Each structure stands twice: as C-alpha cells, then as structure tokens.
C-alpha cells in the first residue's frame, strides 16, 4: 500500500480534494483497492481535546491557553502560536510524534485490509518530518484571494489569516523543492480532483516523483 501526502497552505482546499479522491471509484479500481485518508491536523486537534497529559505539556508552554478545568482554549492557543514562531515550532515538536504514530497505525490497518492507498493530509509535512515516511506528496494550492475568501467564510479575521500565512511563509517553495506535485485548487472542484487523481495514478503506477519527498 502506498502512502501519499496532501499538503499545502491553509484554505487551499486540501480536505475537499481528499474527500473527492476517497470517493472516486474509478481511481480505486485503477489503483487496485480502497483509498483511505487520515487528517494529521485533525488527529492533533482531537489529542489536544482528549489527552490530559498533552494538555498539561501545552499549558506549560502557553499558560494563557489553559482553562480552569485543565482543557485548552484553542483560540488563545492559536493566537499565541501564530504570533511567536519559536513557540509554534516548540508546539509542533511536542505534537507531531502523535501524528506520526496515528499515521503508522492507519497505514498498518490499511495494509491489513488490502487498501491500495492512504492519503495523509497535513499542512506541515516537510517541517514535521512526516514526508520522510511517505511515497510522494501532492501540493494543493490556490490563489491567495480564493484561500482568504474560504478562511473568512470559516470565521477567521483578516488579521488571523495574515498571521497564519506568515507562519506558513515559504511552504510552497519547500514542498516543490522536495518533489511535491502541484495541484491547482483554484479551478472547479471537479477539475482539481481530476488533476489530483491523475497525479496519484502516476505516483502509484510508475513510482515517479520523489519516493522520499523530504530528501
């Protein structure tokens, strides 16, 4: 079973494309099995909500994000993290091992079930080191105005969007340098999903692209 990363800046449309790919029966037939997906960022969000030990470790770094009951205020946490690059790196170093473990479990489960492909959705595939374990990466991107519009619809303010974009500065360049295949998600949803499906067929059938995208 192959494992392919799906990375790109916030608001680019990664989740929409991943959903379309997992539902693409023609693609599954061509690849020879089911297409599974795991959202590494969602795994970490769940861990922050459900793991008291992780909550304590994060609160030690960001005391202002700790609520009286020990849970974390995600808004305060994000605000602090995206204002301080050093803090963001420390938080990522604390959490990414959990994502790596979840991805390994999903991969083993997929192999046991006979699945053909596991899609690993994450923004920071390169910086986290997760790309080293994958067979390739798709870079999903869209023009800034489209991404900003999607994020405003999610409830983020222009200031919050600016901070997150600053934290992800250079992401596209690093992904392309690492061999990621670019997917233009500024087109229609169907066109973007079709382009991503074609890229996966190429990666899975010929092995083209960097088998160690971080190398």
Which residues does each PLM region occupy?
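Hydrophobic anchor at the beta1->P-loop junction of P-loop NTPases
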Residues: 6
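P-loop (Walker A) phosphate-binding loop of NTP-binding proteins
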Residues: 9
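ATP-binding Walker
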Residues: 12
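Walker A/P-loop
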Residues: 15
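ATP-dependent small-molecule kinase phosphotransfer cores
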Residues: 42-115
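Small-molecule kinase domains that catalyze NTP-dependent phosphoryl transfer to phosphate-bearing small molecules
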Residues: 102-103, 130-133, 152-215
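ATP-dependent NMP and nucleoside kinases share a basic, alpha-helical "lid"
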Residues: 104-112, 117-153
